[in-house]
């Protein structure tokens, strides 16, 4: 049931906003190009990467290029779809973490159900909708910060993900 709701929630912003259409995830493509440049041994910062006639620089730290390198091995469309699905799942998990922190007396199941109901609304909010349309990592970074700061029993030392 949760999987079905997540799938519906993933497409809801497009249905509400502009109807079903696929966005070109321009930022995701820059991440891929940075990963490709790293794998090829190219300098990340001496050239721009052309995306739809727009020249964009790779503005992320070198570690990001290393982390983005696996994206160069998969087709753009599969990577963009995977990024969208991972972002939606991460957003759901962020809502669960915040709900657990804000409503500590409830069972974990209650937090997951609440997150499932909140997720479709969260997906149509402009910052989240644009994160999805550009293929950005914002929600993934937020998830890392929340896991690092609000998890009750962290499995890594605090501060690792920040």
Regions found by a protein language model. Give the residues of each.
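TM-lumen/periplasm interface segments of multi-pass membrane proteins
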Residues: 1-111, 130
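Hydrophobic alpha-helical transmembrane segments of polytopic
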Residues: 2-6, 118-119, 141
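Alpha-helical transmembrane segments of multipass membrane proteins
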Residues: 66-70, 127, 143-147
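Membrane-helix interface segments
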Residues: 76-78, 110-115, 153-158
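Short helix- or helix-capping micro-motifs
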Residues: 114-123
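Short acidic/glycine- and proline-prone juxtamembrane loop motifs at membrane-interface regions
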Residues: 129-138
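Specific aromatic-rich, kink-prone transmembrane helix
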Residues: 139-157
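Transmembrane helices and adjacent periplasmic/lumenal helix-loop junctions
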Residues: 160-162
């Amino acid at each position: 049931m949760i999987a079905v709701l997540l799938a519906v929630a993933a497409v809801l912003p497009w249905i509400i906003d502009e109807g079903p259409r696929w966005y070109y995830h321009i930022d995701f493509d820059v991440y891929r190009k940075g990963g490709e440049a790293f794998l090829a041994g190219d300098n990340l910062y001496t050239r721009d990467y052309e995306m739809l006639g727009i020249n964009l620089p790779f503005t992320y730290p070198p570690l990001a290029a290393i982390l983005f390198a696996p994206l160069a091995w998969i087709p753009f469309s599969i990577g963009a779809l995977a990024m969208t699905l991972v972002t939606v799942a991460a957003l759901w998990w962020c809502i669960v973490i915040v709900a657990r922190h804000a409503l500590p007396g409830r069972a974990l199941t209650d937090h997951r159900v609440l997150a499932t109901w909140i997720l479709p609304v969260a997906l149509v909010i402009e910052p989240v909708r644009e994160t999805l349309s550009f293929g950005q990592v914002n929600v993934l970074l937020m998830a890392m910060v929340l896991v690092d700061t609000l998890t009750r029993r962290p499995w890594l030392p605090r501060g690792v993900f920040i």
